[in-house]
Structure formats: C-alpha cells, structure tokens
Amino acid sequence: MKIHFVGIGGIGMSAVALHEFSNGNDVYGSNIEETERTAYLRKLGIPIFVPHSADNWYDPDLVIKTPAVRDDNPEIVRARMERVPIENRLHYFRDTLKREKKEEFAVTGTDGKTTTTAMVAHVLKHLRKSPTVFLGGIMDSLEHGNYEKGNGPVVYELDESEEFFSEFSPNYLIITNARGDHLENYGNSLTRYRSAFEKISRNTDLVVTFAEDELTSHLGDVTFGVKKGTYTLEMRSASRAEQKAMVEKNGKRYLELKLKVPGFHNVLNALAVIALFDSLGYDLAPVLEALEEFRGVHRRFSIAFHDPETNIYVIDDYAHTPDEIRNLLQTAKEVFENEKIVVIFQPHRYSRLEREDGNFAKALQLADEVVVTEVYDAFEEKKNGISGKMIWDSLKSLGKEAYFVEKLPELEKVISVSENTVFLFVGAGDIIYSSRRFVERYQSSKSSPSRVLGSNK
C-alpha cells in the first residue's frame, strides 16, 4: 500500500510512518519545515517533501494527517479531489493496533508519559520481550530513536490531547496524572475530560494511577504515590550520580529502587513502572536492574554542553506545563546546589498560556533568573492579548529577575554568561535550536565570556 503522511516530521507521526515502512509499505510524506526527523527518514530512503504542496503527490492509496494539518492544506485538498481516503493519525494508529492484535502496554497523562513509556519499553527490552515501541521522544537504545519494531508486545505513548485517545483498549495502562492540559479540545469541559479517562479505563485489563491525582486516582486497579497508594516510597538519597528510594507495598517495606536519571518525578515514574510489572507477576529483580540502567530520553534534563573550566552547563528540556517546569527546576536545584540556575523558556501554544497564565510564573520563580520568549504557536492562531509578556509581567510582580525577547535571535542580547551557571533551555517548540546556537557562540567567544544585558529587564 502507498501511504502519504502529511506532517511526517512530527515525533508521533514519524513513528507511525516508520512502522508502516518497516511493514513493507510504500511510505512518503511532507512537512512544513525540515526537522531532525525528516532528515532521518530521508536517510532511510523515505521521500520527504518540504514544504506542503499539491504537487507532492505519488498517487497514494491513503493519506494520514495530524490534527495540526488544516483542511485547507493543499495536499488534503488534492486528496479530497482525487477521492483518496484521509485518516487522522490517532484513528489510524488505533485501527493498526486492532489489526495486529498484540499485547498492549500504554502510558497516558499530562506529565511524564514519554519518560514512563520509555521506562516500560526499556524494561521489556531488558527482559528480552522484543517489544514494538512507539515513543513521543528520542531514546538512544531504540533502533530509530522514537520507534523500534519487535515481535513481542506493543508499547506506546498515548496522547491525551485528542479526545479520541479514549477509544483505545490497551491491556495495561499507566495514567501518570490528569491536569486538564488541552482542555480546549474537550469543549473546555472538565466533565468531558474526566469521562475520557474513565472510558479508556473501562476498556483496559489493568490500570495503574497516581494516588494523589484528583481526576484519575479512583480509576486505578493499582495505585502509586509518595505517601498514599498501593505502592509508596521514601527517598534515601539523591545526588548527581544516583537516586535511592525505599519502595513500600501496602505500607510494608518491599524493595530498594536505584536510578541514574535525576529528579524526584522520575522516581515516581519508576514507581509506576514497578507497580505495573509487579501487578502482572513479573520477577522484579531484572525490572529493577533495567530501571537502574535507564539513561533517559532526549530533551528530558539532557546535558547538551559542559565547560569544566568555567563550570557552565547547558541543558535541554521539553517541559511545557507548569508542573513539568516545577519538577524540572526542583531537579536542577537538587543536582546543582551551588550553581546559578538560568531558565530560557519558550511558551508552547496560546491556548495553554491563556489557560495557565500565572501558574507558569509561579513555577519559573524557582530559578535564579528567567528569560521568556514569545509563544511557539504549534499551528494555533494567535490570540489577541496572549503573549509571553504575560509570564514576564507575572514574574516581575513576584520580584523575580526576568527578561522578555520577542524573537529568538535576540536571546544573545539578554543572556549574561558567568562561571558556575546552569542554562536551561525549556519548551516543546524550537527552543532547542537556540540552545545549540548559544553553545556555538559560547565556544567561539570564550576569550570574552561576558555579555551585556539587554534593556528589557
């Protein structure tokens, strides 16, 4: 079958495209711009067109699109004219899973789903279960970063941003939490949002939930939490090299967990994975071995650069909700106790900024200094009055040292470089390219390590 993917550069879309390519289908696609994923797919021999155009046409049997692709996209218009079936990526993915009839491990929720999915996949690979993995991030141990084909169970990250996620029926499901992100896709109805989680839980054999989550804790056959839940934990130690925690089951000491990835939120992610595999009757010794070996996912507290002479770090992180940012900064302060923490934050989506507003500033105030950029729209239309300046204004009202830049190239004017500083480039948009440019500029100008601050303080 010949399949055309419109928006193939997305992390979820490219994973589905890789799956169809590995199944022997004739795959090609288009994207609005070049990305690391489009470059990777092209190297594999998959034809990629940039940008979108009605001329990007190989007479496909099927066109697959993401919700970000509008109906007036020239390729979608042509597909309708040619009477070629058009399917939403999530719908097609659900139908693919139904056809293949494999054991399914799924992870959904607002925060932590990529890392938790990666942990589940890593454990199953360690156990030699040969999983097929669909990941919303890049993990070095997967053949294609965000995808790997196996002959065992399927592990996938399930994006709750679309209400259709409730139509899936995995065998096993971890719900990390549900904080109302993407509520606009549910008619701004919390009842409708909650109902979607309830629906998928009814279609699942075993559900693991966070015991302290108001919306979904009651859905769990098994729960995990800090002090509340079937599985709880007590931190023993945390350093740059390792975290240790005592896991309790039903209030009794059960086992010791060791992790090489930093952050208390990752301890909770690992606890969810332990709850899942223990409830399924797995021997936990190799599960714990796998978790201790786990090295994380790209853009999740990823150290992109370190200069040992000046003790300057550059870290990339995908955090884009207030809770994720709070977890990130708490981790940074634990790992870098004596360094200055500077955050360069790119808000992601106007709808999220409008909904959360002051919550971003409350999370960001944990940093020593904050630079806020303009919003990365993620294909949303700009909303009047909604701007990154809102966060900047809120930070100033909290007495926090903060700066605002409208365009990413202006970052150079406002970032002050000094020794013993950790620079966190944070967001789900294209802020990672600013991180790389920052490192390049720093390396080329080490002889003059100070920069003049801008005037928009």
Curated annotation (Swiss-Prot):
Record flagged with keyword Cell cycle: yes
Catalytic activity annotation: UDP-N-acetyl-alpha-D-muramate + L-alanine + ATP = UDP-N-acetyl-alpha-D-muramoyl-L-alanine + ADP + phosphate + H(+)
Subcellular location: Cytoplasm
Pathway: Cell wall biogenesis; peptidoglycan biosynthesis
UniProt entry tagged with the keyword Transcription regulation: no
One Gene Ontology CC term in the entry: cytoplasm
Binding site for ATP: G109, T110, D111, G112, K113, T114, T115
Enzyme Commission identifier(s): 6.3.2.8
Major subcellular site: cytoplasm
Alphabetically ordered keywords of this record: ATP-binding, Cell cycle, Cell division, Cell shape, Cell wall biogenesis/degradation, Cytoplasm, Ligase, Nucleotide-binding, Peptidoglycan synthesis
InterPro entries noted in UniProt: Mur-like_cat_sf, Mur_ligase_C, Mur_ligase_C_dom_sf, Mur_ligase_cen, Mur_ligase_N, MurCDEF_pg_biosynth, UDP-N-AcMur_Ala_ligase_MurC
Gene Ontology biological-process entries: cell division; cell wall organization; peptidoglycan biosynthetic process; regulation of cell shape
GO MF term set: ATP binding; UDP-N-acetylmuramate-L-alanine ligase activity
Function in brief: Cell wall formation.
Family note: Belongs to the MurCDEF family.
Name of the molecule in the record: UDP-N-acetylmuramate--L-alanine ligase
Organism in which the protein naturally occurs: Thermotoga maritima (strain ATCC 43589 / DSM 3109 / JCM 10099 / NBRC 100826 / MSB8)
